[in-house]
């Protein structure tokens, strides 16, 4: 997909509020869970926008990480690119480790 669908723009507008609820340090997976919990309709719409690719969770989450990286140095900083974490399904995985500024 050349550019992210509009649904990612809608979710990005929720970032400031979600970041306010996060601990000082958090993983991308923790951020996704908080975003999904607080903005369920928008999150489901985001998943649906990526459904044709066959991996909607992975593809949406990659798009969301790209948007989070736009905030680096302003609101957050990426401490580790690959940090041990459980994904949103509870499966051992890796994700970014962030710190609020």
Predicted regions and their residues:
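Phospho-regulated, low-complexity intrinsically disordered regions of nuclear gene-regulatory
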Residues: 1-21, 29, 34-37, 41-101
């Amino acid at each position: 997909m050349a550019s992210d669908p509009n649904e990612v723009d809608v979710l990005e507008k929720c970032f400031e509020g979600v970041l306010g609820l996060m601990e000082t340090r958090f993983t991308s997976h923790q951020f996704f869970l908080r975003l999904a919990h607080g903005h369920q309709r928008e999150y489901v719409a985001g998943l649906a926008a990526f459904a044709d690719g066959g991996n909607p969770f992975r593809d949406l989450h990659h798009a969301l990480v790209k948007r989070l990286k736009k905030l680096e140095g302003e609101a957050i900083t990426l401490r580790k690119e690959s940090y041990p974490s459980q994904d949103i399904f509870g499966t051992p995985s890796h994700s970014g480790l962030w710190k609020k500024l």
